[in-house]
Amino acid sequence: MKHPSKEKVIFHVDMDAFYASVEQYDHPEYRGRPLIVGGASGKRGVVSACSYEARKYGIHSAMPVSWAKRLCPQAIFVPVNMRRYQEVSRAIMKIFDDFTPEKIQISVDEAFLDMSGTERLFGPPARAALLLKERVKTATGLTLSVGIAHNHLLAKLASDFDKPDGLVFVKKGEELAFLDKIDLKDIWGLGKKTLETLHSFNITTVQQLRETDISILQKIVGKAAGDFLYKASRGIDPGIYTERVKNRSISSEVTFEEDTRNIEGLHKTLLHLADQIMFRLLEQGYVGKTVFIKLRYSDFSTFTARQTLKHPLRSEEEIHKIALDLLKKKWDNHSLIRLVGLGVSSLEKKGSHQQIELFCDAADQHSKVENAVQIIRSKGRNINKASLIPHRKNGV
């Protein structure tokens, strides 16, 4: 039980190189070697994740696999095994739930935990974070990084500051000192294009950013980005995550390491997000009727779009198709995208208000497949759909 606390305590918990770390845990022969998790190895494949050993070669997520092979030909390349990652994620999220019911899950490997008032249960924040790290390491063999602060923005920046296996606590009154230690490029959400624009005006540090008048920032990078950077440079939370309504939707999102307009990469990302969301809907026993997407562009402007159906969503394919339609309507195919999010809302417990249908259409068949996948998955067996498995030529 939580007890009243005068001060917010927010943890941002981020698994270290999650997909790659799961593969290295499952395959000891991969440990200590550059490992790349991604799609097809041809020109159109995209890196989904990579180990820290691979990052030393300049490899990052959303990079074409062909580029990664040129940068590090000796790397190990493995396909995405989303069901396995979801299995590990479920175990991790259950541990998080043991620490607080106030959890905002951002993706399979990342969450905000509101630990306000839990000191009587777990001790001071730093001690609670160490206990959390130990629990996860014991249960899964994986490491994570924890950022602790009084708001979501600072907690996120803190978790990124000392990866991997880090623990950084930004106490009240120490915000500016902490911010001045980080590189300007590491301000969360700051894309390459915006960074280049700031550099062209000789704004190269967080302190210089903070000393720049907000009206000038807005003229340089636009109103939305100017407002965001003005607040971020002062450690003020822009409210990106605090406005979420708990238990009203299931969503996931991805922030790209480099702004992108790669349409195939965006489609593949939305497919992975749809798979994650459908898995969580089935696991938690919910159905939903509304699909929504979120796009954040390189100038920090953020847009959402949604579509509500008359019937509950019944498959990952249905969610993905609607997401692609919304993307097509909302995106001009030219603006650089920094973040893409996907979610399902208008939730209700499965079977609570569903009408009996006379005929079983294709969507119903997809729904049955989704449920079968969940049953197999619940028995500890890995299973992936063909759409999430890299294509191979000549049946090899």
Each language-model region and where it sits:
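Gly/Gly-Pro- and Ser/Thr-rich, intrinsically disordered tail segments characteristic of DNA damage-repair
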Residues: 1-228, 234, 241, 363-396
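Short, charged/polar surface micro-motifs in flexible loops or helix N-caps
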Residues: 18, 41-44, 298-301, 347-349
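DNA-contacting surface of Y-family translesion DNA polymerases
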Residues: 3, 12, 186, 194-337, ...
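Short, hydrophobic beta-strand segments
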Residues: 111-117, 304-307, 349, 354-359
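Surface-exposed, charge/polar-rich loops and edge strands
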Residues: 177, 259, 348-351
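Acidic, metal-coordinating catalytic segment for phosphate/diphosphate chemistry
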Residues: 311-396
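A glycine-rich phosphate-binding loop feature that marks nucleotide/adenosyl-phosphate handling sites
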Residues: 148-153, 233-234, 287-297, 339-348, ...
